[in-house]
């Protein structure tokens, strides 16, 4: 019977499954897996190489070594399949069963599983509520544990040392049980009543008040409940039977010379078997306790080492002094099972070779070497040869191919025709790193690549290699052609702009072609059409740059798709009219009629794609490339040393700078400036000198004087080769030319500080030894940085992909009414990013109204295309609420409307698009372009720090935002609020400029007044912070007592005396509680109230503030009462580049974060402690006050009696995203993270669409903490998926809604907190994740991409999405049928059925 079952088991291999569950294996389950017990440590016989019986490679247990042949050779061949040989006991079957049949070892004494013991938090420890140290002492036979206290004073689980045990024995005899080792722990676990324990803890939870105890109890409840729910038994954490891995998964290979190469696991298993057998023998002999104990301890250690070597104590090493690789090491880390074999496999039908340029290829083609193609397409060739009758058998075909007969090459051509291949360049940082091409057979051994796809691959031809993969099945070929073909990937998924853009030679060629020159041959001609222009150029009658008039025919495409032709005579050049011949119909001539640089060419392709669509764009791109190459060759551009022109002014500029530096040096020596100021000033002088030299140099290079036809001097843009290359954007930049022809400038030391002696020479003049030595620092640092950067950037991408991998578009519309408000990004006086770029391709969340009227311009749920954006710009809208992924209400996915446009395709995103992975790639791919450094503020940066006024750049109207202000006696506005900002808007109400206004700034214009450009609108003292009165009256001193709370000082230079308030730390004794303040009173001595409130005007003076008023002085509103010097807030380093992006996505709390107001109310200060101030916020509605202790050195932005709103900044500093989420909500934190990340990328000139960052933010916000679970299955304080709470809340009445607070998790935490344990385990901390999941019997729904890749099926995205949807429907159907069939049988029917069955059975008997 068993054999029959076994046979059925082997045949029925394909198992359809929907979920995967991980749990603890009971001893019975382990025995059911096993095909026999392993009793001996032997492996194979060294002479015969046959496996030993009952050993680790036993053929009787694991199966035959040769296919269909038993070990002794009695039964051979297929006809005996399934027979079990009576001589050697081996079943005759395939040898591959040795990969799947397991064995087992019956342990003589139970041993604890190290994962559940040592993986923190220790599961056994938590369950037993015993410290880990105590459990370890019991397990490793150092102490006893009481398993049953009986009627004695001993408690269960009490730890006894050897002496205490003997004493207890004397005292109580055998009234109690105490044991040591894993048996003891196993017994305690077995006797636990989980349900009862759980109820007791829950009762205790209600009674307890201590926070730490509460946390611990909650953890225990969760663990015990997961045991109850999953059906795992606690005693299974102690092993009594050890499963043994199939032998072919831990191979033993004979090497020549009689030695063996073996897997480390065999050593580890051998140790366990040896010790186990010895222990059995000792127990049979009834050996002394101490010996048995030692043997048991050694067995426990051997099992530990097998499961996870090195987790406890020293790792066991092999003969080569290296730690042995245990089972845990097999699955974790980069070389482990998950990352090495499941997520990244090597594939068949692939090859790699060096790439060279294929300038004659079309965009969808690549050159494939014949040798390579022959090898890759072998099976296809064999098939074709057989079908066409050239070969009778496959073997013959094989021979023909080996001989490389001529017919083979013809067949190869046929096979390859329209069969796309995929080219991949490592590192594949985004999806454009693999694209499909049609192969063209070429001679040679290098793959030829189309130059325009180099940008997407980030490839160059300096020895890069690429891999070729052949899609085999029809579906694969179809997908390669429809989705991956290079012609279908013209736009970048990161920002929606063309990625197929010409660079280098092509750009230079087009630039040269479209330049004009005065006084060229053929200037002033009138030509009938571009064809004639080309003819004249070819025959040498006119030059390429000659200014001529040409009759041009333009074709315009109207709204109704009709094409209108218009003919004009246009001033242009010969070159531009030749270029016009390749521009597709439908584009305006103005696109070509200018000097074309890299930006304008990209713009031209973009316009072409939006107006004409894919096909014309692809052909246009190819034509641009051919033309560009051709004219770059004709231009004969090359760089010579004479092209590097050094400006004449250079020496003078440097002399002046040296003179200024010597002046500063003198000032320093006479003590007028400090060392730091001197250093900063010197660096500033040199930096500006460098700028001046660069300006002079560029002026010199970029303009040449020429004499025109009338004999007059004229200036025109220069034809200097170096300038042309930089100006066109082909290669090089102003900064590089500056090093060639200007001066190299300031260099940095290895620690990042700037060396104050600059390199005044350039490369044309050459450097002297010292200058050369200084410049080596920078060069080396650059190389070291690059290596670091690549690793860090790769790790960031990996974390991003992991956190977002399961986010897929799953429905069309989630019908949400929420969204986020978009405004243009304005910093200071310039628009960094206009609104159209931020909202293009998004869906409108609520109707956009025409300002001032109530007509709807754009209706809700409209996808904003280029046309709509132009319309919005025309109507001067500068604020739109758009749908966003963050506010999308789809559970386990996102809806298409909230995501908007698929950037790489230009239409609304399709269902099944893996937007999470695309977002992660878009953010991670440019990571290598970011800097690694933290900026130390010095020199140039310190000048920016102290702005003291605002000078506007545009004409417009002044608008103050959330500004409280008073008007002083000079009729100026004085700002008295913290977050005031000032906007300049144009006559249509669009924001042109935006500035922050500090407290105490004087504003020269009132709200709504007009202002002209260049006017100074506001000014303030950047070095002090004033305290300003909002009322007029007379001053009365309170608690201002000389030498107790204040001191009087006189300024040495001016002779003016002033009062300085002492800090609390400087006061003595009783004076510490005095609170110096200024009260404002009227003539009658009564309090004056703050405007609009009933709070008396009283201003408290913080320590170190300076007063220049006397008691009783008359003051007016807007006057300064006291000043605080701001010099104390030291300069902090700014983290920039990659580390900053990583910090934001990991949601790290800054070191000294800004302190925000937790509630709205009035500020006051309570009793101080030694180093801290007590800040009290009293709500206006009279509910509970909020208190917070703030360190004294923190500079506070608020004064006593001031009113703050929830989330206002109380003390400056970098804001913590967690605080923003808690106090200002999801929208604010989204906006914060998006803007901060964009700032870093914008600095490097990298464009990424906001929605990608929003996708990652959505994943960071996917968890929430339950505040009160009401009647639901959730515990208070439990962290769970936000979508689960949303589902629960949608299904309950409004009174029973669950209260929760959203959590912001960093991307690493969020990846590990995913519901899928397979995904989490393959990411990081494999052991911990698997331990946790096994205990709670987790079920993996296989929702994400990663899990499905690991179990080896189609991913639920893209073309695999429909397959998974189908399976889901089938599953639902099955479930409903199952339910209905269960429900339809009544009780009578059931009893009837039973009677019938019994009758039938009786009759049979």
From Swiss-Prot:
Cofactor binding description:
Binds 1 Mg(2+) ion per subunit.
Where Mg(2+) binds, per the record, is at 460, 462, 464
- Origin: domain of life: Bacteria
Q: Which GO terms describe its molecular function?
A: DNA binding; DNA-directed RNA polymerase activity; magnesium ion binding; zinc ion binding
Give me any GO biological process, just one. Answer: DNA-templated transcription
Please tell me whether the keyword Transferase is annotated for this protein: yes
List its EC numbers. 2.7.7.6
Query: Required cofactors, per record?
Result: Mg(2+); Zn(2+)
Q: Does the keyword Metal-binding apply?
A: yes
Q: Which residues bind Zn(2+) 2?
A: 814, 888, 895, 898
Give the reactions, separated by semicolons, that this protein catalyses.
Answer: RNA(n) + a ribonucleoside 5'-triphosphate = RNA(n+1) + diphosphate
Binding site residues for Zn(2+) 1: 70, 72, 85, 88
Task: Name any one Pfam family assigned in the record.
Answer: RNA_pol_Rpb1_1
Q: Which InterPro entries match?
A: DNA-dir_RpoC_beta_prime, DNA-dir_RpoC_beta_prime_bact, RNA_pol_asu, RNA_pol_N, RNA_pol_Rpb1_1, RNA_pol_Rpb1_3, RNA_pol_Rpb1_3_sf, RNA_pol_Rpb1_4
Entry GO CC = DNA-directed RNA polymerase complex
UniProt KW keywords: DNA-directed RNA polymerase, Magnesium, Metal-binding, Nucleotidyltransferase, Transcription, Transferase, Zinc
The family annotation for this protein states: Belongs to the RNA polymerase beta' chain family.
UniProt-listed NCBIfam families: rpoC_TIGR
Question: So what does this one do?
Answer: DNA-dependent RNA polymerase catalyzes the transcription of DNA into RNA using the four ribonucleoside triphosphates as substrates.
Name of the protein this chain belongs to: DNA-directed RNA polymerase subunit beta'
Task: Please report the organism this UniProt entry assigns to the protein.
Answer: Wigglesworthia glossinidia brevipalpis
């Amino acid at each position: 019977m068993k054999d029959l079952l076994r046979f059925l088991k082997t045949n029925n291999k394909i198992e359809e499954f929907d979920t995967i569950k991980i749990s603890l294996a009971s001893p019975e389950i382990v025995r059911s897996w096993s095909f026999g017990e392993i009793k001996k440590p032997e492996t194979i016989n060294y002479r015969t190489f046959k496996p030993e019986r009952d050993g680790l490679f036993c053929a009787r247990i694991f199966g035959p070594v040769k296919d269909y042949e038993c070990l002794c050779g009695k039964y051979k061949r297929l006809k005996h399949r399934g027979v079990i040989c009576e001589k050697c006991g081996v079943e005759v079957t395939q040898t591959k069963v040795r990969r799947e049949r397991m064995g087992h070892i019956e342990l003589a004494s139970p041993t604890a599983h190290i994962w559940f013991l040592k993986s923190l938090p220790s599961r056994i420890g938590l369950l037993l509520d015993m410290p880990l140290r105590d459990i370890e002492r019991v397990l490793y036979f150092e102490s006893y544990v009481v398993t049953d206290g009986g009627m004695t004073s001993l408690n269960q689980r009490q730890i006894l040392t050897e002496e205490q045990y003997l004493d207890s024995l004397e005292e109580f005899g055998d009234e109690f049980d105490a044991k040591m080792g894993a048996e003891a722990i196993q017994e305690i676990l077995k006797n636990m009543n989980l349900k009862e324990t759980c109820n007791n803890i829950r009762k205790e939870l209600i009674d307890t008040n201590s926070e730490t105890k509460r946390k611990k109890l909650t953890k225990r409840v969760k663990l015990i409940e997961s045991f109850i729910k999953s059906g795992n038994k606690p005693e299974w954490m102690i092993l009594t039977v050890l499963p043994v891995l199939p032998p072919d998964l831990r191979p033993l290979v004979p090497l020549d010379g009689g030695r063996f190469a073996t897997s480390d696991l065999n050593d580890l298993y051998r140790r366990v078997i040896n010790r186990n057998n010895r222990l059995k023998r000792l127990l049979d002999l009834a050996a002394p306790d101490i010996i048995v104990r030692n043997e048991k301890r050694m067995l426990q250690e051997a099992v530990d080492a097998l499961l996870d070597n090195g987790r406890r104590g020293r790792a066991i090493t092999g003969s080569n002094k290296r730690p042995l690789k245990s089972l845990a090491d097999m699955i974790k880390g980069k070389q482990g099972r998950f990352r090495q074999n499941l997520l990244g496999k090597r594939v068949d039908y692939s090859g790699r070779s060096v790439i060279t340029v294929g300038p004659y290829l079309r965009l969808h083609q690549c050159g494939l070497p014949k040798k390579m193609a022959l090898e890759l397409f072998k099976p296809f060739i064999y098939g074709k040869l057989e079908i066409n009758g050239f070969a009778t058998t496959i073997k013959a075909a094989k021979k023909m191919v080996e001989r490389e007969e001529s017919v083979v090459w013809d067949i190869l051509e046929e096979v390859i025709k329209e069969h796309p291949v995929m080219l991949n360049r490592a590192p594949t940082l985004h999806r454009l790193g693999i694209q499909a091409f049609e192969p063209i057979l070429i001679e040679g051994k290098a793959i030829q690549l189309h130059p325009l796809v180099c940008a997407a691959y980030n490839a160059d031809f300096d020895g890069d290699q690429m891999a070729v993969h052949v899609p085999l099945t029809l579906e694969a070929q179809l997908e390669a052609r429809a989705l991956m073909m290079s012609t279908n990937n013209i736009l970048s998924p990161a920002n929606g702009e063309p990625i197929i853009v010409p660079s280098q030679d092509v750009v230079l060629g087009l630039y040269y072609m479209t330049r004009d020159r005065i006084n060229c041959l053929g200037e002033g001609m009138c030509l009938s059409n571009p064809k004639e222009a080309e003819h004249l150029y070819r025959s040498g009658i006119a030059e390429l740059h000659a200014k001529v008039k040409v009759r041009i025919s333009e074709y315009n495409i109207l709204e109704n798709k009709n094409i209108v032709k218009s003919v004009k005579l246009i001033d242009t050049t010969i070159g531009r009219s030749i270029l016009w011949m390749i521009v597709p119909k439908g584009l305006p001539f103005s696109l070509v009629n200018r000097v074309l640089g890299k930006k304008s060419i990209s713009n031209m392709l973009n316009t072409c794609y939006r107006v004409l669509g894919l096909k014309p764009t692809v052909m246009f791109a190819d034509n641009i490339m051919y033309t560009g190459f051709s004219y770059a060759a004709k231009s004969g551009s090359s760089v010579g040393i004479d092209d590097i022109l050094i400006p004449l002014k250079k020496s003078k500029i440097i002399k002046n700078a040296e003179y200024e530096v010597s002046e500063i040096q003198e000032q320093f020596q006479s003590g007028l400036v400090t060392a730091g100021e001197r250093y900063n000033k010197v660096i500033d002088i040199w930096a500006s000198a460098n700028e001046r030299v660069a300006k002079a140099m560029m002026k010199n290079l970029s303009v040449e004087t020429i004499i025109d036809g009338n004999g007059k001097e004229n200036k025109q843009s220069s034809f200097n080769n170096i300038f042309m290359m930089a100006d066109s954007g082909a290669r090089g930049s102003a900064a590089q030319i500056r090093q060639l022809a200007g001066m190299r400038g300031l260099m940095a030391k290895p620690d990042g500080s700037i060396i104050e002696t600059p390199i005044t020479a350039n490369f044309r003049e050459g450097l002297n030894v010292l200058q050369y030595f200084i410049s080596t620092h920078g060069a080396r640092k650059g190389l070291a940085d690059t290596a670091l950067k690549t690793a860090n950037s790769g790790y960031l991408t990996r974390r991003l992909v992991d956190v977002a991998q399961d986010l897929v578009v799953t429905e069309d519309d989630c019908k949400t009414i929420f969204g986020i408000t978009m405004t243009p990004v304005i910093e200071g006086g310039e628009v960094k990013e206009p609104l159209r770029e931020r909202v293009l391709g998004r869906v409108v969340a609520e109707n956009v109204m025409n300002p001032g009227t109530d007509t709807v311009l754009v209706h809700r749920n409209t996808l904003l295309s280029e046309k709509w954006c132009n319309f919005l710009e025309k109507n001067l809208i500068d604020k739109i609420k758009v749908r966003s992924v963050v506010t999308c209400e789809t559970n386990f996915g996102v809806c298409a409307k909230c995501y908007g446009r698929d950037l790489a395709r230009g239409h609304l995103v399709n269902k099944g698009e893996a937007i999470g992975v695309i977002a992660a790639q878009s953010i991670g791919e440019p990571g290598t372009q970011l800097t690694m450094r933290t900026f130390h503020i010095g020199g140039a940066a310190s000048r920016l720090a102290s702005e003291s006024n605002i000078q506007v750049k545009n004409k417009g109207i002044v608008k103050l935002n959330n500004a409280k202000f008073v008007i002083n006696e000079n009729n100026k506005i004085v700002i008295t609020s913290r977050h005031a900002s000032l906007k300049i808007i144009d006559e249509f109400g669009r924001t042109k400029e935006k500035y922050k206004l500090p407290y105490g700034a004087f504003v020269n214009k009132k709200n709504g007044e007009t202002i002209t450009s260049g006017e100074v609108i506001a000014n303030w003292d950047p070095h002090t912070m004033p305290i300003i009165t909002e009322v007029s009256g007379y001053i009365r001193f309170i608690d201002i007592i000389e030498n107790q709370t204040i001191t009087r000082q006189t300024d040495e230079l001016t002779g003016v005396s002033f009062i300085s308030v002492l800090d609390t730390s400087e006061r003595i004794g009783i004076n510490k509680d005095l609170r110096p303040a200024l009260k404002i009173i009227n003539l009658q001595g009564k309090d004056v109230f703050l405007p609009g409130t009933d709070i008396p005007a009283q201003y408290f003076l913080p320590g170190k503030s300076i007063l220049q008023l006397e008691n009783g002085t008359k003051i007016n509103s807007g006057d300064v009462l006291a000043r605080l010097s701001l010099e104390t807030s030291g300069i902090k380093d700014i983290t920039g580049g990659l580390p900053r992006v990583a910090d934001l996505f990991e949601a790290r709390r800054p070191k000294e974060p800004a302190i925000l107001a937790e509630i709205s109310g009035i500020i006051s200060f309570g009793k101080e402690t030694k180093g801290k101030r007590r800040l009290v916020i009293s709500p206006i509605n009279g509910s509970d006050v909020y208190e917070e202790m703030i360190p004294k050195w923190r500079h506070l932005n608020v004064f006593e009696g001031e009113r703050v709103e929830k989330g206002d900044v109380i003390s400056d500093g970098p804001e913590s995203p967690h605080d923003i989420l808690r106090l200002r909500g999801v929208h604010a934190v989204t906006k914060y993270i998006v803007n901060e990340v964009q700032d870093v990328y914008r600095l490097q000139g990298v464009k990424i669409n906001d929605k990608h960052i929003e996708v990652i933010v959505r994943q960071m916000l996917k968890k929430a903490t339950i505040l009160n679970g009401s009647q639901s299955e959730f515990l208070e304080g439990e962290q769970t998926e936000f979508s689960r709470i949303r589902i629960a809340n949608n299904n309950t009445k409004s009174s029973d809604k669950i209260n929760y607070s959203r959590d912001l998790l960093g991307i690493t935490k969020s990846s590990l907190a995913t519901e899928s344990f397979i995904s989490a385990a393959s990411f990081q901390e494999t052991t911990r994740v698997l331990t946790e999941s096994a205990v709670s019997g987790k079920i993996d729904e296989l929702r994400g991409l990663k899990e499905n890749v690991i179990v080896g099926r189609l991913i639920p995205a893209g073309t695999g999405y429909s397959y998974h949807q189908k399976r889901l429907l089938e599953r639902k159907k099955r479930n409903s049928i199952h339910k209905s069939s269960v429900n339809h049988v009544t009780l009578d029917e059931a009893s009837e059925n039973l009677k019938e069955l019994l009758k039938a059975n009786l009759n049979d008997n």
